[in-house]
Amino acid sequence: MAGCGNQPPAPDWAVNAEAAAQRASTAYLQGQPRIESLQWQKARASVASTGRTDLAARMELIRCATQVASLEWDDCPTFQALQPDAAAPEQAYARYLNARPRAGDAGLLPKEQQAAARHIAAQAASAPLTAGEVRQMTGAGDPLSRLLAAAVLLRAGNASPELLQAGVDLASAQGWRRALMAWLLLQAKAAERMGDADMAAHIHRRLELLQK
């Protein structure tokens, strides 16, 4: 306990940036764009006060990770503008968000994402995941970390009913309306392709409820 007391407090900018980024991420997942935009402005302003482009790059990756978890996939252009100044862990994280991790990237990533990164980097070709593989690669960490791992695996071409259900369940349990709608829409398309009319109808009823 005495040792904890000797640690210097985090500077105000860092505390403010982290809090605003968390609020922005939650607002995005819940489908509250006005709050999301305001909080990202606060987070970016706090980081900008340091004049450090490497930290600004890290902040943009946090935003992009939330979008990836909600199945909004692009190349994270706001990070790309700062990419030359990003540190090695952030470079690896950006590749991971694009489902293109290199063989040595896993050790640079948050531990919750390492299993998925190793799987993607090692596989010769994309393949549906079994229930056990889904649990192994999406079962660690906080709900957003788990949803992100599922989304990156999906982006890498590892779609399976078990993976889609994991994404749906994670988003539903947190009440993340926007993320849940994205996962349900994909699950509905999969059910329709398989000719499972009952499943597709059930999913569409869930989507109708979300839109109320």
Identify the function of each model-found stretch.
Residues 89-176:
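Extended amphipathic alpha-helical interaction segments
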Residues 20, 39, 55-56, 60, ...:
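TPR repeat positional signature
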Residues 43-73, 173-182, 192, 211:
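Short, charge-rich amphipathic alpha-helical segments embedded
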Residues 63-87, 100-109, 192-200:
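Alpha-helical linker/edge segments of TPR/alpha-solenoid repeat scaffolds
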Residues 23-24, 43, 63, 148-153, ...:
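Structural register within alpha-helical repeat arrays
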Residues 1-23:
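Bacterial Sec signal peptide processing site at the extreme N-terminus
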Residues 9, 16, 35, 56, ...:
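Residues that mark the junctions of alpha-helical repeat units in TPR/alpha-solenoid scaffolds
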Residues 9, 21, 28-31, 48, ...:
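Hydrophobic/aromatic side-chain positions at a characteristic register within alpha-helices
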